[in-house]
Amino acid sequence: MSWNTVVGLEIHAQMATQSKMFCACRRQAGALPNSNICPVCVGWPGALPVLQGEAVRCAIRAAICLGCDIQELSRFDRKNYFYPDLPKGYQISQFYHPYALGGSIP
């Protein structure tokens, strides 16, 4: 049996938006701890995230620049983790239906 090497790349980028991805709290580097938070940020029961359009536009522009295929259907999912530095116990992810697929770095 022969094996082929397969290498994947997952890219995370911090976007230069005024607010966070799923709430209207300011995205401010260097701010005092817990000064730019809301019920959505800390995962309070009943607090629902609201996707910020500015962040989506930045993500789509980046995907176009990388030559990705922009998908017509997109969905967010919760990925549950039990890490001490993740008090909500989950991350919001696009594992199954991301905004973009493929692409390359020229």
Stretches found by the model and what they are:
Residues 1-106:
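Basic, nucleic-acid-interacting segments
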